[in-house]
Amino acid sequence: YLWRQDGSFVSSKKERAGVRNTAMDGSDQVIRETVKRCIDSLIEESHIEESQVQGIFCSGMLTSNVGLEEIPYLCAPVDERALCNAIECRFFNDITRIPFYMIPGVRNHVENIGIDTLEQMDVMRGEETEAVALLRERGKGEDLIFVLPGSHTKIIYANEEGYICRCKTTMSGELLDALFFHTLLKDSLPDFFVGEEEYDYQAVSDGARTAQKNSFTSAVFKTRIYQKYVHKDKKKAANFLLGVLMYYDCLSICEFKKTEALEEVQFVIAGKRIIAQAVYDILTDIMQEKKVHLLDEDELMAAKGAFRLAELYYKWKEGE
């Protein structure tokens, strides 16, 4: 994502390659070549020179051991200033001469991590940067739980002072993909996952209520029974499966709220629209949560957070 210094968005470039390649191949060559290609294309298509770009701010898995370089996690609680102060500058001359500024991930504060404290421990890379943008939009003064559905669903507690305090992760997005394309259920589902216009509230609700009465693996298999005997429409079956998985995510969200002893917390859901909609519907209709806000999908959320941290970084650096 390319931004002007005044905060206006210029352009973006995406490619289907990522840290998964590094994890599978044991080499970071693909990710480095992909990052270089995207940067070169952005510069060329925006008709600017490399020297005009002040810096490249990275968050997420690019700052992990399967990214460009691993940057240690910050220990929660952290605010945007703490994140900004922990940014580390790196140069990768095989990619570009522009300096990279690596935004660290955040981990829960847990002493003596072991099997007895495993439940308390979790980490995030990238979502803390999204949380910075969300906190800027919402403002301080209230306890918030951000729910960020995607390949993983990240549940983040930010307190009324604007500190990111704790997180919890589920793998529902990756599980949905695996179940959809790599199990027996493939025969009961459409060739591609349903789009936003094909979202079916009733089928999602059917899946969630089935999950209430069954174990996870049993509820998942009920997708096949649902398509075979209840609704032949495979798109309805896809929505049913979505409801099953998101029910268990919503269980995790409610348990997270209880663990943090948050009575008056506001839930803010931001992420892939169809998954976010399912989370919203299950939280409000089945879990009976009242203070739930569903935001429009914003693919610039992480980029907005990174730009905010870049602003602060240069401002404080100049003030030193």
List the model feature ranges, each with a label:
Residues 1-30:
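Short glycine-rich, Thr/Ser-proximal phosphate-binding strand/loop in the N-terminal lobe
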Residues 20-26, 107-210:
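Glycine-rich phosphate-binding loop plus the immediately following alpha-helix
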Residues 35-55, 250-263:
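Phosphate/pyrophosphate-binding loops at sites that engage ATP/ADP/AMP, CoA/4′-phosphopantetheine
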Residues 42-121, 160:
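Short beta-strand-loop/turn "lid" adjacent to the catalytic site in phosphate-handling enzymes
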Residues 209-252:
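Adenine-nucleotide phosphate-binding core of ATP-dependent small-molecule kinases
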Residues 261-282:
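Glycine-rich phosphate-binding loops at beta-strand->alpha-helix junctions
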